[in-house]
Amino acid sequence: MKTELTLLDRTLTLHRFPNRSNETLQAWDAGDEYIISHVEEMNLEPGKHILIMNDSFGALSAWFSKDHDVTMMSDSFISHRGALKNLQRNQSNRVNFLNTMDDIPHGIDLVIMQLPKTNRHLVWQLSQLRQALPEGCQVIGVNKVKDIHTSTLNIFEKYLGETKTSLAKKKHRLVFSSPNCQPIQTVEPFVEWDVDGEDIRLKNLPNVYSGEALDQGARYMLEHIPQDPELRHIIDLGCGNGVLSVKAGQLNPQARITCVDESFMAVESARQNIKDNLGEEGNFQFIANNCLDGFKKNSTYLVMCNPPFHQQQAITDHIAWQMFCDAKHVLSNGGKLIVIGNRHLGYDVKLARLFGEANVETLELNQKFEILQATREPANFNK
């Protein structure tokens, strides 16, 4: 796996986060190289204030912070931590970190953005740029050619201004736009809906998975959250909008519930949904984190988990494996991990390897999903 980005007589050492010994994926892509080359050809005067949005692991921030004042804005805790590590690794100049719910700073001279995965997040970011940037400030986006559609360009035109694209290079394309003087399109941050068959109403911020309806996996999982008066602490790992936590809180009002996600918008959505559905009297925590980094061993009784199978734009199963390992670490003896996943992902095999085959059972399955339960045995359990 390549860890050195060499371009225009400069070299940066870049790693993904978390740093794994058997990593097979790079911390940058051809889109980063394309946009770096283009901006360097612009011959900007040193000291420009550059806003970099959705920088996966800090390659763009590390590059441009050498000569410019850089603000990095991302919804991803993983991206923030990865960028910080890479900035330190390359002894880069200081970068200001923001999440995508923060206000866009004044005095931006140029915006560089990796286009987000969902149109709803793109609409949000462009609408925020439109309100904050001076007319004519250039915005340069980049993405794979196959992911830039006519609808993508229409969103730029509608929410920002006149838009054009570059030629394709290494399967990537640049998008050029700037704010115009037309009336601003107002975008509400939340969408709301009721969950059919449940006494639950949900709000989702723009970058939260399954933005305008409950995804099938979460709906299936709702039916299998345990009700146990002995439960004292529940962790919702990869909480998304917090729907599992809301249901768990309804069933187990005595329990302390901790919502964890790497998306700042997901954590804030969970906070809002628990407040709206359960009130403010309960004992709840909301943490943006890399899985369960920093959590104490043997500190909880139940972990609920609906793992993602992508990190940034890459398809990968290492996040699920890290979630399972972290869950085992924090579970008390006899504590349980309940997982939902697509059947083809083979989570049963992974859990059996980690917890022991005798301690993994299938709670429910249908043609698409399976719900698995793994029980933590005492430390002297012989595998």
Swiss-Prot record:
Q: Could you say which enzyme class this protein belongs to?
A: transferase
A GO CC annotation recorded here is: cytoplasm
Q: What is its EC number?
A: 2.1.1.174
Keyword tags = Cytoplasm, Methyltransferase, rRNA processing, S-adenosyl-L-methionine, Transferase
Q: Which residues are in coiled coils?
A: none
- Tell me one GO molecular function of this protein: 23S rRNA (guanine(1835)-N(2))-methyltransferase activity
- InterPro entries under this entry? rRNA_m2G-MeTrfase_RlmG, RsmC/RlmG, SAM-dependent_MTases_sf, Small_mtfrase_dom
Q: Does the keyword rRNA processing apply?
A: yes
Q: Determine the domain of life of the protein's source.
A: Bacteria
* Principal subcellular localization: cytoplasm
Q: Known catalysed reaction(s)? A: guanosine(1835) in 23S rRNA + S-adenosyl-L-methionine = N(2)-methylguanosine(1835) in 23S rRNA + S-adenosyl-L-homocysteine + H(+)
Role, per record: Specifically methylates the guanine in position 1835 (m2G1835) of 23S rRNA.
Say which family it is in.
Answer: Belongs to the methyltransferase superfamily. RlmG family.
Q: What is this protein called?
A: Ribosomal RNA large subunit methyltransferase G
For this protein's source organism, the top of the classification is: Bacteria, Pseudomonadati, Pseudomonadota, Gammaproteobacteria, Vibrionales
